UniProtKB/Swiss-Prot annotation:
Domain EF-hand: 40-75, 146-164
Low complexity: bias regions: 249-265
SUPFAM superfamilies, alphabetized: EF-hand
Name of the featured protein: Actin cytoskeleton-regulatory complex protein END3
Annotated EH domain residues: 8-98, 130-222
GO CC terms of this entry: actin cortical patch; endosome membrane; plasma membrane
CDD domains: EH (cd00052)
GO biological process: actin filament organization; endocytosis; endosomal transport
Source organism (scientific name): Saccharomyces cerevisiae (strain YJM789)
Assembly mode: Component of the PAN1 actin cytoskeleton-regulatory complex composed of at least END3, PAN1, and SLA1. Interacts with SCD5, SLA2 and YAP1802. Interacts directly with PAN1. Note=The interaction with PAN1 is prevented by PAN1 phosphorylation by PKR1.
Region of interest: Disordered: 226-265
Keyword Phosphoprotein: yes
Start and end residues of each stretch annotated as Polyphosphoinositide (PIP2)-binding: 96-105
Amino acid sequence: MPKLEQFEIKKYWQIFSGLKPIENKVNHDQVLPILYNSKLDSSVLNKIWFLADIDDDDNLDFEEFVICMRLIFDMVNKNISSVPDELPDWLIPGSKVNLIKERKKRKQIENADLPPKKEIKVDWYMSPDDLNQYEKIYNSCAKLTDGTITFNELSTKLSTKFFNISKTDLNKVWSLINPQNLPSIDRDPTFYFIHCLRQRNDLGAEIPASLPNSLAEVCNKKQLSYDLRSSQPPTKRKEEANEVDNLRDNGQNSSSDNSGSNVLSNENSIKQKYASLTDDQVANMREQLEGLLNYKKSEKTQGGSKLSKRINIRSITDDLDNIEQQVEVLENYLNNKRHELQALQAEIN
């Protein structure tokens, strides 16, 4: 690390004067633009600020400002690979030597009094206050058309709030709560992303290697894709319809067979399927079966000719439903492409 030159000190004085110091000191907010323009990790910048603020008053006089700027430039220009734990002697101003010695003594005493450091684990429980705070951060983020948030958007937002986390921390937690490596995540994983990083920032909690099973299910939840080229399997609506159709088939078979054993067998089969369904599926199934009952009643009263007409109408209705679903997918796909086109045009302009 080369020593300070006179031209450097003049350059730092020009920058210092431009910040409009009060009583020959600048505070953290005044220096903040310079810190962020360096593109260094917040953990690195915090360590530089701590080393430079020798008198621990949360302000920098000119001598301390010179230390701060020199360490930043050395890191940016790769003159040093990491911030030193202590200032080199040639960078300590003569007026600050005694303060440095006092700081070292305090640190030795504090370290001697500290109990052995225990590993802090992430607590995944979120209190109502936590949820309110995370909701505000979530609402302040720019979202994609499907309501999800990208890594860059979240990391930029959190870097202005959590100063003790590094880019490595951000990447680790993103991989943890995004095991499918999706380009963006929705609301629930976003909350867990913020919650984990907050404990890392405030408590120094260790980032876990895996999620609890209950959280893994939330973070592994698949997002609905509107890309027509996607190989995503059919939606849940179709799966539920298939289950109801299977139950309807069982009902039709039982009505065509008068034997008590077949009826009992079909009844047990229906009960087993019924027990495995969710509330939404049960409601959907009930609606379908009531429709089937009404259909059977009308079949007996109106005869075979009207039956064939109703079957044809049902077939046409199903076709219309399928076409309607395809139109919705195409409209969403068109809207996404329009947004992409607008973004490209904005970049060109």
